[in-house]
Amino acid sequence: MSKTVLNAVGTPLYYSGSSTAWFSATGSGPTLHGTAGNDSMWGDSSVNVTMIGGRGDDIYYLYSSINRAYEAAGEGVDTISTWMSYTLPANFENLTVTGSGRFAFGNEADNIIKGGSGTQTIDGRGGNDVLIGAGGADTFVFARGNGSDLITDFNYDDIVRLDGYGFTSFEQILSNVAQEGADLRLHLADGESLVFANTTADELQAHQFRLSLDRSVLSQTFSDEFNTLQLRNGTSGVWDAKFWWAPEKGATLSSNGEQQWYINPSYEPTASVNPFSVNNGVLTITAAPASEAIQAEINGYDYTSGMLTTYSSFAQTYGYFEMRADMPDDQGVWPAFWLLPADGSWPPELDVVEMRGQDSNTVIATVHSNETGSRTSIENSVKVADASGFHTYGVLWTEEEIVWYFDDAAIARADTPSDMHDPMYMLVNLAVGGIAGTPRDGLADGSEMKIDYIKAYSLDADWQI
């Protein structure tokens, strides 16, 4: 009989049974079939193959993105095991991801999701799932509407990320837990709950929880909902379309390995390729290949794009800074929303969000500092289940701590460096190259970053993080 584990609602979830047949993709054709029994199907990183176990409990070992697994509905309890970041397809029950720094995301069914000895981000998504960290400092993600889950091995270094449940303080967490024998149940909302196996309330720590943004302590100080684009013109307008130090023709950041030139629409020789457009309250920044005529004006760079700053119009010390945007998913593009010191110095720098177009499941949140006398950076590469479409990206900057948010849910924290206590202004841009690499297709169809709004808030004087 197959091994089982009870989930948070008392339903037994099954592990795949022991295999009775074994198959390898090495030397196979494009399709590899199993038997009607329990199969182990081994991929090969050099073989482009779809493996089909068929009936029975099948276990698939995937070694690269060209190894694929397929199961029809009702064909046993099936498991995928891989070192890669992976989202479980339909008709699979269980997933193991062993690679450190990877994510393991479930599907809409009741899943058993397991990590490895390193650090993983584990999100069962829909269904009532059983989650197993299996060592390392893991992040467990729970979003409202995705059911009730159980963590079998929550430890001191693990993190729980709660999205949409309205918890804004650790005290609220403690007031909603109840001991059930050896287990601790956290009551969430709408009948959903999270169970910590073999845990008591006094073992929970505030640092283990990433909670929702408390908007009641915020007072709006800046807002642009982009019904029009208010470019600076003398002493009026909001946005500069170039760095404060750049000439009228614009510039780029060559030290970042960027392959685009940021076009200043007010510079006549390149005004024909204005990267900014506004439609229905959404600002679009477009990156595109540069024609030979334009290249002659922009130092030979291959691409054009746009950047905006509030250097001339707005800066603030501490507060909450937020952008709602639809990020591009094209290979080789690098969208960002960030803060720089109003006095023109660098570092420090506070990156609210950066992304690589080809990696839409990773939100990069970074703080740069010179507090030690040399440049240091704390980078958080946060795994999210779905960053397609519009989402909010924010950072809460206080005297003691910096907290990053994705859709109002905290995703990362860092201490505020000693050189980050002066006013900073906002920047938003769409770069090409740099950390995202070279576009695979030369951006033949262009790439678009769409921004619904950018806002800033101050904090109530008596509020503490």
UniProtKB/Swiss-Prot annotation:
Hemolysin-type calcium-binding repeat copies, ranges: 33-50, 105-122, 123-140
The record ties this protein, via SUPFAM superfamilies, to: beta-Roll, Concanavalin A-like lectins/glucanases
One GO CC annotation = extracellular region
Stretches assigned to the GH16 domain: 206-462
**EC number of the protein:** 3.2.1.-
Q: Where in the cell is it found?
A: Secreted
Q: Principal place where this protein is found? A: secreted
Q: Which keywords annotate this record?
A: Exopolysaccharide synthesis, Glycosidase, Hydrolase, Plasmid, Repeat, Secreted
Q: Cite the annotated pathway.
A: Glycan metabolism; exopolysaccharide biosynthesis
Which top-level group of life is the source organism from?
Bacteria
GO molecular function terms noted in the UniProt entry: calcium ion binding; hydrolase activity, hydrolyzing O-glycosyl compounds
User: Main role?
Assistant: Cleaves high molecular weight succinoglycan to yield LMW succinoglycan. Dynamically regulates the molecular weight distribution of succinoglycan by cleaving nascent succinoglycan only during a limited period after its synthesis, perhaps before it undergoes a time-dependent change in its conformation or aggregation state.
Note the PANTHER family from the entry: GLYCOSIDE HYDROLASE FAMILY 16 PROTEIN (PTHR10963:SF55), GLYCOSYL HYDROLASE-RELATED (PTHR10963)
Q: Which family does it belong to?
A: Belongs to the glycosyl hydrolase 16 family.
| Name used for this protein in its record | Endo-1,3-1,4-beta-glycanase ExsH
Source organism of this protein record: Rhizobium meliloti (strain 1021) (Ensifer meliloti)
Lineage here is:
Bacteria, Pseudomonadati, Pseudomonadota, Alphaproteobacteria, Hyphomicrobiales
